[in-house]
A protein has these predicted regions:
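Short secondary-structure transition/capping motifs
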Residues: 12, 73-77, 107
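Glycine-rich active-site/cofactor-binding loop and its immediate structural neighborhood
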Residues: 64-100
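Hydrophobic alpha-helical transmembrane segments
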Residues: 1-72, 113-231
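Active-site His/Glu-centered metal-binding helix of metallohydrolases
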Residues: 80-88, 101, 105-109, 137, ...
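Basic, amphipathic juxtamembrane/active-site segments
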Residues: 87-127
Length: 231
């Protein structure tokens, strides 16, 4: 199973930037562990989801704008935590025995908190939960692939970094909407984009996995037959 986003570590261009490497080195020098950074990502997601939720009930445009700015900021801080925990663990050599759990579990909670928060904020909790469910399912298929001995499939079109880009962009665009009409069309569209995009991602990853499993089985069968003939 080869292609874009395949392997055992999510391909991120930001990992090779000077600022990220400098920040990771500083974090490594401190007593902060990768697990603590991963746990902090859930806090950032909770703050993002809470900001989205409260923005829908804000009494004035000014308060709503402030909450949307905070939501965008916390979405990006969630991604920053996701970047740094891996860098501190791998490049910093501070990986822990339970690291694989904390590398995955907080991400699932974070997606749920953010998208459920958006849904509640625009009075469409069902859509928010649908986006959250499909987001979690993308990771499930990826981990299912790894559990069956295949490389992790980080392909899109709606992988984690794409989902956070949509959420952040929607929060910022909603500032204009808040000042103009006070509606929530931008966030509604964003949830649909995440839900549908995540569903497509699930199908794409599932198709890759099934195809690879069949190819592997066929290869093993051919090798077995060839071995019998050689004997």
């Amino acid at each position: 199973m080869t292609g874009e986003g395949m392997g055992d570590r999510r391909p991120l261009a930001s990992r090779n930037t000077r600022w990220a490497q400098t920040l990771a080195r500083r974090m490594t020098a401190l007593s902060v562990t990768p697990n603590q950074i991963s746990q902090t990502s859930m806090l950032m997601a909770a703050l993002a989801g809470g900001s989205f939720w409260l923005s829908g009930a804000a009494g004035g445009a000014g308060i709503r704008v402030a909450l949307l700015i905070l939501a965008a900021l916390f979405c990006q801080l969630r991604l920053l935590c996701n970047l740094l925990d891996g860098m501190v663990a791998v490049e910093g050599g501070k990986g822990e025995a339970d690291g694989p759990f904390w590398n995955e579990f907080p991400d699932r909670i974070a997606d749920i908190l953010i998208f459920a928060g958006v849904g509640c904020g625009i009075a469409m909790p069902g859509l928010g939960w649908a986006a959250a469910a499909f987001a979690v399912l993308t990771a499930y298929v990826r981990e299912l692939g790894r559990a069956t001995g295949n490389p992790s499939d980080f392909g899109g079109p709606m992988a984690k970094q794409h989902r956070m880009a949509v959420a952040t962009g929607a929060a910022l665009l909603s500032i204009i909407e808040a000042l103009w009409s006070g509606g929530s069309w931008v966030l509604t569209a964003a949830l649909w984009i995440v839900a549908v995009g995540s569903a497509v991602t699930v199908l794409r990853r599932a198709g890759n996995l099934v195809g690879h499993l069949k190819t592997t089985a066929s290869t093993r069968k051919s090798e077995s037959i060839s071995g019998k003939h050689d004997a």
